[in-house]
């Protein structure tokens, strides 16, 4: 069995034949935080490939897999994102951003692409965290001004909807973890 990668941040070892020797997914979920400050350090292409592989491993309605991803490393383009996204200031300091998009021509069940792209976005965040990177989800859809701004900036065709922009890089901050479990939000059997 040939080793593909190992994470030092969560207990994950993946081998080329697809077998996982150990994994602590709950730790990744509970310790992932939104990271908005990044070190001035490039993210290797192989890590981006692993992150995108994880994004595409998410479930999707009737397996339509409507997602497309734009990987942005060009500094000039990264610095333009906050001009069309009011909450995208952190993108200017990130070495890379991934724009998650939906190709509406791939839709089999109208509207379910939002769930599919949400899952892909969450997988990007978790995969980045597991690889020692920090990331933050900045929403684009459903706000039309953001959708049109990102579409225009990246020459995205009309049938493709930009869903989220996820800047990522090596963290330059550690916001710590916190317990978000709230039993008051749980209802048994009925509301």
From Swiss-Prot:
Family matches, as InterPro entries: Nitroreductase (IPR029479), Nitroreductase-like (IPR000415), Nitroreductase/BluB (IPR050627)
Binding residue positions for NAD(+): 127-132
GO molecular function term, any single one: oxidoreductase activity
Pfam families for the chain: Nitroreductase
EC number(s) given by UniProt: 1.-.-.-
Cofactor(s) required for function per UniProt: FMN
Span of the signal peptide: none
SUPFAM superfamilies: FMN-dependent nitroreductase-like
Similarity comment: family membership: Belongs to the nitroreductase family.
Listed name of the protein: Putative NADH dehydrogenase/NAD(P)H nitroreductase
């Amino acid at each position: 069995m040939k080793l593909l990668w190992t994470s030092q941040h969560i207990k994950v070892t993946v081998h080329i034949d697809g077998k996982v020797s150990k994994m602590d997914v709950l730790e990744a979920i509970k310790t992932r935080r939104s990271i908005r400050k990044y070190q001035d350090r490039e993210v290797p292409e192989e890590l981006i490939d692993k992150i995108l592989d994880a994004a595409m491993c998410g479930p999707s309605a009737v397996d339509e897999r409507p997602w497309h991803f734009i990987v942005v490393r060009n500094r000039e383009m990264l610095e333009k994102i906050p001009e069309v996204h009011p909450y995208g200031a952190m993108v200017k300091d990130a070495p890379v951003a991934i724009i998650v998009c939906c190709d509406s021509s791939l839709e089999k069940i109208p509207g379910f692409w939002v769930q599919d792209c949400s899952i892909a976005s969450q997988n990007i965040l978790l995969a980045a965290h597991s690889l020692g990177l920090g990331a933050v989800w900045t929403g684009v859809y459903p706000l039309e001004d953001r959708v049109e701004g990102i579409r225009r900036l990246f020459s995205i065709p009309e049938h493709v909807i930009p869903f989220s922009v996820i800047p990522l890089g090596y963290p330059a901050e550690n916001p710590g973890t916190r317990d978000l479990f709230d039993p008051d939000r749980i209802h048994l059997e009925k509301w």
